[in-house]
Amino acid sequence: EESWDDYLYWQETDKRIVKKINELIKDTRRTPFEGKGKPEPLKHNLSGFWSRRITEEHRLVYAVTDDSLLIAACRYHY
């Protein structure tokens, strides 16, 4: 739910960020561990999650299962 709130925040404040998030999600669905946004695996309490850069400050944080993509956050730095 937090990630949806993040997404709604961007829809209200910066359409360019929404476009970038959508591009990153599309790319992540195709190639989860390489591509746009400099994908990197997260460590410690976020082990199993990956991040991609939306901007210098904000990250798309996600996990991939066999058949789905879980978006954990798309605002701030994990």
Each PLM stretch: what is its role?
Residues 5-19, 23, 36, 42-43, ...:
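Enriched for short, Lys/Arg-rich terminal
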Residues 30-31:
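Blade/loop signatures of beta-propeller domains
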